Amino acid sequence: MQKLFIVLVLFCILRLDAEVDGLTVSLCNQSECQEKCKKENKNGKCIQEIELNWVYNICKCF
């Protein structure tokens, strides 16, 4: 029962991280990033940033 609870808690934490925009540990889809930035008349690129031993994949518009 404890293992199930731990797995459930970890799943909720990871799901919460994936839903937050900005600096989160997530996958960046290049085509979605370009579409998002095209609306701002900019070029989009997936960038990896490292902060406190975490790697963040985020979309940047240039």
Curated annotation (Swiss-Prot):
The organism's place on the tree of life at top rank: Eukaryota
Assigned keywords, A-Z: Disulfide bond, Ion channel impairing toxin, Neurotoxin, Potassium channel impairing toxin, Secreted, Signal, Toxin
Single GO cellular component term: extracellular region
Keyword Cell division listed: no
GO function terms (MF aspect): potassium channel regulator activity; toxin activity
Free-text function comment from the UniProt entry: May block potassium channels.
Protein family: Belongs to the short scorpion toxin superfamily. Potassium channel inhibitor family. Alpha-KTx 23 subfamily.
Protein name: Potassium channel toxin alpha-KTx Tx790
Organism: Buthus israelis (Israeli scorpion)
